[in-house]
């Protein structure tokens, strides 16, 4: 079971003080455990792509408009294009959270579409809605906008805004997006039990810095 879960894990390192040696270790672990991807900040994409060139099943994932989601659609589109040029094959973008709360749904939709269009045919797009900052109504609206924009996944959290994934949020997101969109649980998934709870609730991908601990049946005390 833990081995099949490994293939659902985005092995994640997004800390601002990340070093090159840590990225090398992250990629080595991803190859050893057959994780779905490594998820790194944009500055590390080219290195990760180089390190994983002999492991085509391990994707290179990066983050866009991260962690606040407060850049413009044009900037997010440029970030996406640049990341893909550097070797990213998956992008996790943060929505404009304030615009969602203001019910500026057209702006939020345009924000997501800018990244989807920039990534089209080249990279999967995952939409981070930052569940810990949203009401249930806002979570539903964000998921609906992601579906409408043509995203591939919805994702719970950045790991930088306090709360992380909950099984309740995953179940709600799965209900809204239906069976055909991916749902990624991220933030606070620290052991195999946490991961199984998210998968049982409807998650198809797990974002975690604790990937090795998860597949080894241990527990990690990280924030992501």
Curated annotation (Swiss-Prot):
PANTHER family: DEOXYRIBOSE-PHOSPHATE ALDOLASE (PTHR10889:SF1). Keywords: Cytoplasm, Lyase, Schiff base. HAMAP family: DeoC_type1 (MF_00114). One of its GO terms (molecular function) is deoxyribose-phosphate aldolase activity. Pfam families: DeoC. One of its GO terms (biological process) is 2-deoxyribose 1-phosphate catabolic process. This is Deoxyribose-phosphate aldolase. The active site is at residues 92, 155, 184. NCBIfam families: deoC. Pathway: Carbohydrate degradation; 2-deoxy-D-ribose 1-phosphate degradation; D-glyceraldehyde 3-phosphate and acetaldehyde from 2-deoxy-alpha-D-ribose 1-phosphate: step 2/2. Coiled coil: none annotated.
């Amino acid at each position: 079971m833990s081995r099949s879960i490994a293939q659902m894990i985005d092995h994640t390192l997004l800390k601002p003080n990340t070093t090159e040696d840590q990225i090398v270790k992250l990629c080595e672990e991803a190859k050893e455990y057959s994780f779905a991807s490594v998820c790194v900040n944009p500055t590390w994409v080219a290195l990760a792509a180089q390190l994983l060139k002999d492991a085509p099943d391990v994707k290179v994932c990066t983050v866009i408009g991260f962690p606040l989601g407060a850049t413009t659609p044009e900037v997010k589109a440029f970030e996406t294009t640049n990341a893909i040029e550097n070797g990213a094959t998956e992008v996790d973008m943060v929505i404009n959270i304030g615009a969602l709360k203001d019910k500026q749904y057209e702006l939020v939709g345009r924000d997501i579409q800018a990244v989807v269009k920039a990534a089209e045919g080249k990279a999967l797009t995952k939409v981070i809605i930052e569940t810990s900052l949203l009401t249930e109504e806002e979570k539903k609206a964000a998921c609906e906008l992601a579906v409408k924009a043509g995203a591939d996944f919805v994702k719970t959290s950045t790991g930088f805004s306090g709360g992380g994934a909950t099984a309740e949020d995953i179940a709600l997101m799965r209900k809204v997006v239906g069976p055909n969109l991916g749902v990624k649980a991220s933030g606070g998934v620290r052991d195999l039990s946490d991961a199984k709870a998210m998968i049982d609730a409807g998650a198809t991908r797990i974002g975690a810095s604790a990937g090795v601990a998860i597949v080894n049946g241990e527990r990690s005390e990280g924030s992501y």
